[in-house]
């Protein structure tokens, strides 16, 4: 029988990165938090789905809080102390994610909203009727 080779997990080496960038993408169905260094290389990430939530509960503020805490604690272990926050989207987990990043121990330097707004571009989807 052929030998099975297991891929070893890549260990995050602790370097004193100092400053990082937190990207929060908040949609109505999910919240994704990615922490990168200043050049854009991913250090840690978490989403509501990867934090154990399924279905409609992924879009809740509590799920966003859990995902942000998970990513922030992971980034703290690699040596990041201060962050700039870039928020994209209009989901319900925006403010909660920012608060939980601050509560995890990361110092926030700036918060920017980079939600893309069309200058009357594509036609929107059909309106939802309830």
UniProtKB/Swiss-Prot annotation:
Gene Ontology biological process terms, A to Z: translation
InterPro entries found in the cross-reference section: Ribosomal_uS11, Ribosomal_uS11_bac-type, Ribosomal_uS11_CS, Ribosomal_uS11_sf
Main location: plastid
GO molecular function, a single term: structural constituent of ribosome
A GO CC term attached to the entry: ribosome
Keywords: Chloroplast, Plastid, Ribonucleoprotein, Ribosomal protein, RNA-binding, rRNA-binding
Subcellular location(s) of the protein: Plastid, Chloroplast
Keyword Plastid: yes
Pfam families for this protein: Ribosomal_S11
UniProt superkingdom: Eukaryota
Family: Belongs to the universal ribosomal protein uS11 family.
Quaternary structure annotation from Swiss-Prot or TrEMBL: Part of the 30S ribosomal subunit.
Entries under NCBIfam families matching the protein: PRK05309.1 (NF003698), uS11_bact (TIGR03632)
Protein name: Small ribosomal subunit protein uS11c
């Amino acid at each position: 029988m052929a030998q099975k080779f297991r891929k070893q997990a890549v260990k995050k080496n602790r370097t004193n990165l100092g400053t990082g960038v937190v990207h929060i993408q908040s949609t109505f169905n999910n919240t994704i938090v990615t922490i990168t260094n200043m050049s854009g290389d991913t250090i840690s990430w978490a989403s509501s789905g990867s934090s154990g939530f399924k279905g409609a509960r992924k879009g809740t503020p509590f799920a966003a809080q859990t995902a942000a805490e998970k990513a922030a604690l992971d980034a703290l272990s690699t040596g990041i102390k201060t962050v700039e926050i870039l928020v994209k989207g209009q989901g319900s987990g925006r403010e909660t994610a920012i608060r939980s990043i601050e509560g995890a121990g990361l110092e926030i330097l700036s918060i920017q909203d980079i939600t893309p707004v069309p200058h009357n571009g594509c036609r929107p989807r059909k309106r939802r009727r309830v």
